[in-house]
Amino acid sequence: MKIVLPGGSGQVGTLLARDFHARGHDVTVLSRRPGPAPWRTLAWNGESAGAWWQVVDGADVVINLAGRSVNCRYHDRNREEILHSRIASTRAVGEAIAAAGKPPAVWLQAGTATIYAEREDADNDEETGQIDGLGKGRWGFSTEVALRWEAALANAPTPQTRKVTLRSAMTMSPDRGGVFDVLLGLVRRGLGGRAGTGRQ
């Protein structure tokens, strides 16, 4: 398969690219800072058209993982970057797919499980999950990002491409630089322990 990974130079994208490449797939990672890799890497700015549109045309699947890291302080500038980077990159991918002569069959779009309200009485899923009301919970900004991010995907004019939102939470991997690495460092410094009620 021909697989394109916008924003695929982060931890999750690297894990996917490594696995797809090992299985013999044709992998292209789109990155703001492309570096050496066993697969093809192309530069993109996450916002506008460019040479990268050519690899989207004829791809079997696009997996968009682009977005500024949320591992930061949530001051106004970072909040704006978190929101803008997700919406702009989603729109850019949608424009590339819409312009393709042979659009991909599937567009997998990163999303976030923080769209759901915190609850202990039932599980949240796509069918019955309770969406957190904006401003009602502690995670109002995260919910706003999630809703606007998904709206950008839904509004993309790509009728020949099936669109799927991946409402994922933190992805744990033993690789350096990921959330597991950060949490493990805290535990090693004696700062581990139960998070919240421990019943999450």
Give the residues covered by each predicted segment.
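SDR active-site strand-loop-helix element
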Residues: P6, L30, V62-A66, W107-A113, ...
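Active-site Tyr-X1-5-Lys
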Residues: L134-K163
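Rossmann-fold NAD(P)-dependent oxidoreductase module
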Residues: L15, D19, A96, A152
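NAD(P)H-binding glycine-rich loop region in Rossmannoid oxidoreductase-like domains
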Residues: G35-A92
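NAD(P)-dependent short-chain dehydrogenase/reductase
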Residues: D121, A156-P157, R162-Q200
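Conserved Rossmann-fold NAD(P)-dependent oxidoreductase catalytic core, especially the SDR/UDP-sugar
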Residues: R91-G137
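Conserved glycine-rich Rossmann-like NAD(P)H-binding loop of the short-chain dehydrogenase/reductase
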Residues: H25-R32
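N-terminal Rossmann NAD(P)H-binding glycine-rich loop of SDR-like oxidoreductase domains
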Residues: I3-R23
